[in-house]
């Protein structure tokens, strides 16, 4: 029985493995995303956090290493600021390089099948602008269609998103405003962890 319990415990640990990919192109200059990652590291020390801007400043992705991280994970979190209605260039590059035919999709590409994908992101503009009548012309959810399509192609499970709006660089003009962004970002992390705990 002891061995059976040990196997169950191991299975539980494996099932809870989380990979968090930071797609900010300049994390050192960030407040919101940097705070979110710092809080995640404190609250989920077992999670693997990958900071793409630090690992690959030249955008030369180590495909094999990144694919191995994906293989180990059960839940994949993409953490990023929304740049021009999409992920930053380094995160796009990471996906282009690691989600390769024969690995993530295609007749023999089933390595991501069944893994859960969660989006965690921030925007500079207020949420009210993301509507059909607002300045952006589309809802936030509509901008996420490409990730849902990616999940469909790779047979991953799209497991939802957590986002925080209105945390722009322009709102960091005083120490008080910077601290406010940090507090908002900690609250964002709490919501993200709540979502992860349901998966």
Predicted features and spans:
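N-terminal beta1-alpha1 ligand-phosphate binding loop
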Residues: 15-46, 182-183
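Residue-level recognition of beta-strand->loop/alpha-helix junctions
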Residues: 22, 51-53, 162-163
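Structural motif
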Residues: 56-64, 173-174
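N-terminal amphipathic/basic-hydrophobic helices that include classical n-h-c signal peptides
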Residues: 1-13
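Generic recognition of short, well-ordered alpha-helical segments
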Residues: 31-35, 61, 89-93
């Amino acid at each position: 029985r002891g061995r059976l319990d040990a196997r169950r415990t191991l299975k539980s640990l494996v099932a809870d493995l989380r990979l968090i990919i930071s797609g900010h192109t300049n994390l050192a200059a960030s407040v919101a995303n940097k705070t979110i990652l710092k809080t995640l590291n404190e609250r989920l020390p077992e999670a693997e956090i990958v900071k793409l801007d630090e690992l690959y400043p030249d955008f030369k992705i180590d495909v094999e290493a990144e694919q191995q991280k994906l293989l180990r994970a059960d839940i994949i979190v993409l953490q990023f600021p929304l740049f021009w209605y999409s992920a930053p260039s380094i995160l796009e590059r990471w996906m282009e390089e690691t989600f390769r035919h024969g690995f993530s999709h295609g007749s023999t590409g089933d390595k991501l099948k069944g893994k859960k994908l969660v989006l965690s992101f921030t925007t500079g503009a207020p949420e009210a602008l993301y509507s059909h009548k607002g300045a952006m012309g589309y809802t936030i959810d509509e901008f996420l269609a490409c990730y849902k399509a990616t999940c469909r192609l790779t047979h991953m499970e799209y497991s939802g998103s957590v986002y925080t709006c209105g945390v722009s660089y322009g709102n960091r003009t005083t120490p008080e405003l910077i601290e406010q962004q940090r507090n908002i970002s900690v609250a964002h992390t709490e919501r993200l962890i709540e979502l992860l705990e349901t998966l």
